[in-house]
Regions:
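Aromatic-Pro/Gly-enriched surface loop or interdomain linker
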Residues: 1-68, 75, 188-233
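Short, surface-exposed beta-strand/loop "edge" segments at domain boundaries and coil↔beta transitions
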Residues: 27, 78, 180-183
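An acidic, glycine-rich "communication" segment
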Residues: 105-207, 232-233
Length: 233
């Protein structure tokens, strides 16, 4: 009985929640484990992770409860009033990161490009003096986490991902391509090895994002990841 309790305690401590925001009055879907990604991630890192897809209703007063939030850009962004702006700033100053993602095909509507652009402007309005920059081959997120200094091959044009940084830290990620979305990866058949090249790069990029979420200072001092996690906790 005690051994089982210890295992459950360890599993809870290593559980990785990918928290997606739900907008409007619709009830939040139930949380669901992502076993395929768990096996693929564990094959590439020193951690035993238990990825869990979780959904929370959008409330600005609850933002700081989470270190990382994911929002699919299926509708125009919510109003950014003064109170919301300062609550988002509190979220980021507490180490939070927000990922603005392409809308899945099943929920997409008209004017997808215009909606994606409006979210980009919405994100910039939180810190008007900052600007978006593309995720290119020179950025630290393009270096594969588990291969140390090896770059991922992102191609000449990089990815359709833009970053907004504050004080040298990524606080906002904007992806306008459904092909590179979290929904596409989550529903793909991934493995520890032998993935097709594009899917492999897709998976590596998201592992880097997960490590960014967990550590808060991604690869900046080359410490072993468990040490960084203990320090952050």
């Amino acid at each position: 009985m005690r051994i089982r309790q210890e295992r459950e305690k360890l599993a809870a401590g290593d559980r990785l929640e990918w928290v997606s925001l739900v907008f409007g009055s619709a009830p939040s879907p139930l949380a669901e484990p992502i076993s395929r990604l768990r096996r693929a991630v564990e094959g590439r890192t020193t951690l035993l992770l238990h990825p869990l897809q979780r959904y929370v209703t959008y409330r600005t007063e609850r933002l700081t409860r989470h270190p990382f939030l994911h929002a699919e850009m299926c509708s125009p962004p919510p109003e950014m009033d003064l109170k919301s702006r300062f609550r988002w700033r509190d979220f980021f100053s507490n180490g939070g990161t927000l990922f603005l993602d392409a809308c899945p095909q099943s929920h997409s509507g008209n004017n997808e490009d215009a909606v994606a652009d409006s979210w980009k402007s919405w994100g910039k309005s939180i810190f008007p003096d900052t600007g978006w920059s593309p995720l290119n081959r020179g950025h630290e997120l393009s270096y594969s986490f588990y291969l140390l200094d090896k770059r991922m091959f992102l191609g000449e044009r990089g990815t359709p991902v833009s970053l907004l940084e504050q004080d040298g830290r990524v606080i906002l990620v904007h992806n306008r391509s459904r092909r590179w979305s979290w929904d596409t990866l989550k529903n793909s058949t991934v493995s520890v090895n032998l993935n097709e090249p594009l899917l492999e790069i897709h998976l590596r990029l998201y592992i880097n994002l997960l490590m960014l979420m967990l550590t808060g200072d991604y690869k900046s001092d080359q410490l072993h990841l468990p040490t960084i996690l203990l320090r952050r906790r």
